[in-house]
Amino acid sequence: RFKKIRRLGALPGLTSKRPRSGSDLKNQLRSGKRSQYRIRLEEKQKLRFHYGLTERQLLKYVHIAGKAKGSTGRVLLQLLEMRLDNILFRLGMASTIPGARQLVNHRHILVNGHIVDIPSYRCKPRDIITTKDKQRSKALIQNYIALSPHEELPNHLTIDPFQYKGLVNQIIDSKWIGLKIN
């Protein structure tokens, strides 16, 4: 993980740790001139590692975004941001996107009252995301919410930390996308 972060820069969804500034300077000196191919490849790898996607999953999302109206890049980022694992991360119910994926896979999360165990589930506006009524599920989410730094919540999401409930208000606005892609 840390090799990826050193190579590609800060990836907030992968870990909360940041690369040291000295290692970044060494990387730039050693690398020389960056070709267009290298820049595109690094940006693609940033997307893959930040959202925890395989190459095939990313290609499917690019294909869907290409068919949709609007800018392909912007639509692609909206599709990725509306995934269930990413929304849990943005709500502060998980410290990282891989942690959110594990919560979903272990069946701790309900969407509109139904258990969802697919991290790539595409959330829609007016979806209500809650935890199971089991004590263990609530304790996990409570720990994450208590430990997470209370950053500004994107305006397409609302959270009720006492009921462990999140709500998707609308499709994400492009200014709230957490990853800077060239």
From Swiss-Prot:
What do the Gene Ontology cellular component annotations say? chloroplast; small ribosomal subunit
> Where does the chain cross the membrane?
none
Record's keyword annotation contains Membrane: no
What keywords are annotated for this sequence in UniProt?
A: Chloroplast, Plastid, Ribonucleoprotein, Ribosomal protein, RNA-binding, rRNA-binding
Kindly list the biological process annotations in GO that this record carries. Answer: ribosomal small subunit biogenesis; translation
HAMAP family (UniProt xref)? Ribosomal_uS4_B (MF_01306_B)
Assembly: Part of the 30S ribosomal subunit. Contacts protein S5. The interaction surface between S4 and S5 is involved in control of translational fidelity.
Q: What does this protein do?
A: One of the primary rRNA binding proteins, it binds directly to 16S rRNA where it nucleates assembly of the body of the 30S subunit. With S5 and S12 plays an important role in translational accuracy.
NCBIfam families assigned: PRK05327.1, rpsD_bact
Q: What is this protein called?
A: Small ribosomal subunit protein uS4c
Question: Which organism was this protein described from?
Answer: Iris domestica
